[in-house]
């Protein structure tokens, strides 16, 4: 029985070919990982546990270093056998030490803030050189265009304050003022007091 011929791999395309779309890679068998998935998971778990223990140990060392430093700076006072005057002197000394520590803390915080501001300024300078800033032009916008840009095209806001006012002509205004000014005459005419008022206003009209 004749042996079957193995299939030949596809020919590699040249870069000068019109249908070339990428670098040609020779076909090869898929590599199998030497470590199984369960073994990988076990190794990751061990690494995470080791990192957790290291972090806990570093935190304990940092806390111990802090306590040691505080013990050197502020040793526990010895109060046995001290009188009132000695206790007062000790209190004044502690208050002075607290003031000095507070001043040092403020100075240190100021230096840290200044350094952070300088670092931020340098970062902005470095980032500013990477981009080309476009030239800004001054554009004059009307009040309606500005409100439309802020509120959107759906909201139409008019800035004409006289739009909602009532328009009154000059002759109508004079008529209304004349009617308002003659309200006493209208009241007298309606009440029948107009003739009597003239009678009393005439000279000697009220004498019989």
Curated annotation (Swiss-Prot):
Region described as Involved in binding TNC: 28-73
PTM sites of type N-acetylalanine: 2
Signal peptide: none
Protein name (database record): Troponin I, cardiac muscle
Positions of region (Disordered): 1-37, 54-74, 168-208
Complex formation: Binds to actin and tropomyosin.
Segments of skewed composition (Basic and acidic residues): 54-71, 168-187
């Amino acid at each position: 029985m004749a042996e079957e011929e193995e299939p030949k791999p596809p020919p590699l395309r040249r870069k000068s070919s019109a249908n070339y779309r990428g670098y040609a890679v020779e076909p090869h068998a898929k590599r199998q990982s030497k470590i199984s998935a369960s073994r990988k998971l076990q190794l990751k778990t061990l690494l995470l546990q080791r990192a957790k223990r290291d972090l806990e140990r570093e935190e304990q060392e940092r806390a111990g270093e802090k306590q040691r430093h505080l013990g050197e700076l502020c040793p526990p006072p010895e109060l046995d056998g001290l009188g009132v005057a000695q206790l007062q002197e000790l209190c004044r000394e502690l208050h002075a030490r607290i003031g000095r520590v507070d001043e040092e803390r403020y100075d240190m915080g100021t230096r840290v803030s200044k350094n952070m501001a300088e670092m931020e300024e340098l970062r902005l300078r470095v980032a500013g050189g990477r981009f080309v800033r476009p030239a800004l032009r001054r554009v004059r916008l009307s009040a309606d265009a500005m409100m439309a840009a802020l509120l959107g095209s759906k909201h139409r806001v008019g800035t004409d304050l006289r739009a909602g006012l009532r328009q009154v002509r000059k002759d109508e205004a004079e008529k209304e003022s004349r009617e308002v000014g003659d309200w006493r005459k209208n009241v007298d005419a309606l009440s029948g007091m107009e003739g009597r008022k003239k009678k009393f206003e005439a000279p000697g009209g009220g004498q019989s």
